[in-house]
Design a protein with these regions (language model features):
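Generic hydrophobic, helix-prone segments enriched in Leu/Val/Ile
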Residues: 1, 9, 65, 121-124, ...
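N-terminal low-complexity or simple alpha-helical regulatory segments
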Residues: 1-22, 26-28
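Compositionally biased amphipathic helical and low-complexity segments enriched in hydrophobic
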Residues: 7, 51, 106, 129-132
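Intrinsically disordered, low-complexity sequence elements enriched in Ser/Thr/Gly/Pro
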Residues: 17, 29, 54, 94, ...
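Amphipathic alpha-helical segments enriched in hydrophobic/aromatic residues interleaved with Lys/Arg
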Residues: 114-156
Length: 156
């Protein structure tokens, strides 16, 4: 089943990269730092969010957490979440890469590799993780974009 992805673009949004195929979507975007999501939302996709520049206030299940550049954010399928600007953030914009993976793909992976328990991992370990500067090097993610393009192009 193919998911329809809806995005409300705001003035100042600059999409650096966008690719969607067969239940996997990669989005690299630069947005004004003062961008605030208006509503809590949820979706059936699992979300892996890397904040490359700037700061964000992330809300999971009505609890607020601060995320800064280099943080990896995991969002469970169906989890209520939202992102807001941080008051006093001197950065004019923030930059992030998000990988969305359809729930059906994770369920299929869990059947093929039951020892990994990917869905259960997201359910138990959602939240914000600090990575080292080496782990967040942009070049690694740009290389990953190329790898994902290759995988997406050769899935079928």
């Amino acid at each position: 089943m193919e998911t329809t992805w809806l995005h409300s673009m705001v003035q100042g949004d600059e999409t650096q990269y966008y690719r969607k195929r067969d239940g996997i979507m990669v989005e690299h975007m630069v947005r004004p730092a003062n961008f605030d999501m208006r509503y809590n939302h949820f979706h059936q996709e699992y979300e892996i969010y890397l904040l490359l520049r700037g700061k964000r206030q992330m809300f999971f299940e009505n609890r607020a957490y601060e995320a800064c550049a280099g943080n990896l954010i995991l969002v469970d399928s169906g989890q209520i979440h939202m992102s807001h600007s941080l008051p006093g953030d001197p950065e004019p914009e923030y930059e992030r890469i998000i990988l969305y993976v359809d729930k059906a793909i994770v369920e299929q992976a869990d059947k093929i590799f039951p020892e990994l328990k990917i869905g259960a991992f997201f359910h138990k370990h959602y939240g914000i993780y600090e990575l080292t500067p080496e782990e967040t090097e942009q070049t690694r993610f740009y290389a990953m974009q190329e790898d994902l393009n290759y995988l997406i192009d050769n899935l079928k």
